[in-house]
Amino acid sequence: MVGGRVAHPVLKGPSEVKELIIGSVLGLAAGGLWKMHHWNEQRKTRAFYDLLEKGEISVVVQE
C-alpha cells in the first residue's frame, strides 16, 4: 500500500502583529461610532436649548 500522505496545513499560533492591527482597527472603528453618537446627542441638546431660549418651546405644561 502506498503511503497515505495527505497534505495538512501547519497550524501556527496567533500572529501578534496581526492581532494588534485587528484590535487597533476595531477599537478605532468603535471609538469613531461612539464619537458620532456623542456629537449627535450634543447637537440635539444644543438645538433644544436654542429653541428654549428663543421661546419657541416651553417646558412648562400649559393648563
UniProtKB/Swiss-Prot annotation:
Its subcellular locations are: Mitochondrion inner membrane
Q: Which spans of this chain does the record mark as coiled coil?
A: none
Q: Which residue windows are transmembrane per the record? A: 15-34
Primary location: mitochondrion
**Looking at the UniProt record for this protein, which Gene Ontology cellular component terms does it annotate, in alphabetical order?**
mitochondrial inner membrane
InterPro entries from the UniProt entry: COX5C
Q: Which UniProt keywords apply?
A: Membrane, Mitochondrion, Mitochondrion inner membrane, Transmembrane, Transmembrane helix
Q: Which domain of life is it from?
A: Eukaryota
The text of the family note is: Belongs to the cytochrome c oxidase subunit 5C family.
Q: What does this protein do?
A: This protein is one of the nuclear-coded polypeptide chains of cytochrome c oxidase, the terminal oxidase in mitochondrial electron transport.
Protein name stated in the entry: Cytochrome c oxidase subunit 5C-1
Question: What organism does this protein naturally occur in?
Answer: Helianthus annuus (Common sunflower)
Quote the gene name from the UniProt entry.
COX5C1
